[in-house]
Each structure stands twice: as structure tokens, then as C-alpha cells.
Amino acid sequence: MSLVLLPAVDVADGQAVRLVQGKAGSETTYGSPRDAALAWQNDGAEWVHLVDLDAAFGRGSNRELLAQVVGELDVKVELSGGIRDDEALTAALATGCARVNLGTAALEDPEWCASAIARHGERVAVGLDVEIVEGAHRLRGRGWVSDGGDLWEVLERLRAQGCSRYVVTDVTKDGTLTGPNLELLAQVAGVANAPVIASGGVSSLDDLRAIAELTGAGVEGAIVGKALYAGRFTLPDAIAAVS
């Protein structure tokens, strides 16, 4: 099975942006989210990873804009950012996206998260944003500024709740073009009992080939952001490299 690539469109203040290590204020702007998403579709993407950064950081929302973008795309969309209650979840699913990512809510409101997973199954994935501090794997929430507990304890709970998919990010790698944390991906895939999507750090076609080596271990896909925007490789090149 070939690795699924999900080009990312991160949206802040109505613009497509990329951050460094997820930090607010580190944005580089790349124009219209609609144009970015349609460009990835035209380049052969099967999925687009669409993120509302303002909602993730709790400083507003781009909900209507994101709904328009999802409506215009013919490919599948994974929608993420600030989905922390029924109202936000219902609105996100109503866009017609294929699935949503829960992040902070999975850490701060386990009961609600369990209920969302029970109700929507495959349409709900959980984002595990990991920071390795002195050897400990800590989870980060609220746009990566709050501590969300121990990765392995939270993963055990989510596994018991029947979570269908995990998006795993090493936050120290995201937006840095320094290569993915392959060890972390393999460790999570080894205990998750569900498919894992890699996020953060991809800088080259070799990085994607290395992630693709983990498909047999349970890594299903990779989100690619800055490397595409920075011109390290094209999406058609990336698709060819992993298929």
C-alpha cells in the first residue's frame, strides 16, 4: 500500500500561512487558501489537510472560508483546528469534509472526545502533538502552548475509546524542514492499533521515502506543508516517490 500524501493548507486571518514549530507570530503568508487547496488538487492530491489556526489558537475562526474551500474541492479534506465542542464539530462535519481532527479536546475533555469517536467513527481522528522533554513524551494542546499529559497514557485511553486514526506531530520538527521523527512514528504505530498519519519536518523526497518504509508498520499517510511551499519538491514528484 502506498503512502497517502496530504498537502497542508494552514489558514490564519483568511490567508494560507506556514508556521515554524507551530508558534503564533512565526507565519509566512502564501496567499489565498482556496487557490492553495485547488493547486494541490490540480497537482494530483487525493487529500488536503486544512487547518484553522485562528480557531486552534483561540483567537477567532475562519469557519465560513474553510467551508467554502471544502465545498469547491473534489478531493477529500481532513479538517483541523479548534474543534472542541459539539457546535464546532457539527459545523466542521457539515462542510462535507471526509474527517476532522480533534486535538486539544482529546486532552482536556476525554468524555466529549469519547462521545465524538463513538458517534462519528472513521470521520474523527485525533491529533497527537508531541514534545519530547528530557526523554519524556509530553502532549501539547491549545495551539501547542499547554501541557496535555503523557503521550502513552493518553494513547492508551484513546485506544480503549476506539479512536480510528491518529495524526502524530513532533512539534519541535514542524515547519523546520529538519526531517520527520521516524522513531516516534514507529513507536506510536506500534501501540496505536489504528492507522497513523505523520506530520511535521518533511524536507525532502528521501524523508517521504523513509516514512513510506513504515507503511507496513501502520503509518498510512504523511502531511506535507512547508517543503512544498518552499519548493523543496513538487507534489507530483512526491506522489511518484512514494507510489
UniProtKB/Swiss-Prot annotation:
It is found in: Cytoplasm. Its EC number is 5.3.1.16, 5.3.1.24. The active site is at D10 (proton acceptor), D129 (proton donor). Its main location: cytoplasm. Pathway: Amino-acid biosynthesis; L-histidine biosynthesis; L-histidine from 5-phospho-alpha-D-ribose 1-diphosphate: step 4/9; Amino-acid biosynthesis; L-tryptophan biosynthesis; L-tryptophan from chorismate: step 3/5. One of its GO terms (molecular function) is 1-(5-phosphoribosyl)-5-[(5-phosphoribosylamino)methylideneamino]imidazole-4-carboxamide isomerase activity. Keywords: Amino-acid biosynthesis, Aromatic amino acid biosynthesis, Cytoplasm, Histidine biosynthesis, Isomerase, Tryptophan biosynthesis. The keyword Transit peptide does not apply. The keyword Isomerase applies. It catalyses: 1-(5-phospho-beta-D-ribosyl)-5-[(5-phospho-beta-D-ribosylamino)methylideneamino]imidazole-4-carboxamide = 5-[(5-phospho-1-deoxy-D-ribulos-1-ylimino)methylamino]-1-(5-phospho-beta-D-ribosyl)imidazole-4-carboxamide; N-(5-phospho-beta-D-ribosyl)anthranilate = 1-(2-carboxyphenylamino)-1-deoxy-D-ribulose 5-phosphate. Pfam families: His_biosynth. Signal peptide: none annotated. InterPro entries: Aldolase_TIM (IPR013785), His_biosynth (IPR006062), HisA/PriA_Actinobacteria (IPR010188), Isoase_HisA-like (IPR044524), Isoase_HisA-like_bact (IPR023016), RibuloseP-bd_barrel (IPR011060). This is Phosphoribosyl isomerase A.
